[in-house]
């Protein structure tokens, strides 16, 4: 089982990196084509602040769907904390800042499934039954991940030393035996499925948001007859 999980991890990470590189390359080419037709306006502090607001506070979503924004913002706050908390299993020695984040990550782990349930409920009610199967699958997958994580934290506690040894063994190409915990195997397998289905466009989102803001600024200048 340990060898199977390790080989699956290498395969999933390889596929993910290929897809990610392809997405970034496509976004870069698309941006070059757009700039060829219409040069981008210069960077300004105001433009940068707007992009930061789009990324950190989901300001665009707030303007269009304030009810959904609540759940989405909670998710975007808690999910990174949960991921960062898990670095304790990937790093040896563990940096102090990772240790500092542990209580925040644990608390975020309990809030995360609530935000997912909220998002699911709002989408079903607002979109009147239309729910793309991909979004539905991703939400259910994240919910299963968070719930199995909570169970591993509170009820079916695995041997954390064995878990860390197994993970570090995969990273160091020195395979270790998988912890004898069925729920951990399920949780780890769900992580691999999530990585495989993770939408790679989110990594290009900052560039897309910046380009969109630049286009808006250029359009505003044209409409109001402003000079650069």
Regions found by a protein language model. Give the residues of each.
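Membrane-embedded alpha-helical bundles of multi-pass integral membrane proteins
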Residues: 2-228
């Amino acid at each position: 089982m340990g060898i199977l999980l390790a080989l699956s991890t290498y395969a999933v990470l390889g596929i993910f990196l290929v897809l990610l590189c392809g997405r970034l390359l496509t976004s870069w080419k698309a941006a070059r084509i757009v700039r060829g037709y219409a040069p981008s306006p210069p960077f300004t502090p105001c433009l940068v602040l707007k992009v930061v607001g789009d990324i950190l506070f989901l300001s665009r979503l707030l303007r269009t769907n304030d009810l959904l924004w609540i759940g989405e913002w909670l998710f975007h706050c808690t999910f990174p904390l949960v991921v960062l908390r898990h670095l304790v299993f990937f790093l040896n020695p563990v940096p102090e800042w990772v240790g500092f984040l542990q209580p925040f990550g644990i608390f975020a782990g309990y809030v995360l499934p609530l935000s997912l349930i909220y998002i699911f409920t709002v989408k079903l009610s607002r979109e009147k039954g239309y729910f793309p199967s991909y979004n539905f699958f991703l939400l259910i997958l994240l919910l299963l991940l968070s719930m199995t994580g909570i169970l591993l934290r509170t009820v079916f506690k695995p041997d954390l030393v064995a878990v860390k040894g197994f993970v570090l063994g995969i990273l160091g190409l020195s395979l270790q035996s998988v912890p004898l915990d069925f729920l951990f195997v399920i949780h780890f397998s769900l992580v691999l499925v999530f990585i495989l289905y993770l939408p790679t466009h989110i990594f290009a989102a900052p560039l897309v948001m910046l380009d969109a803001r630049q286009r808006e600024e250029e359009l505003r200048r044209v409409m109001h007859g402003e000079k650069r």
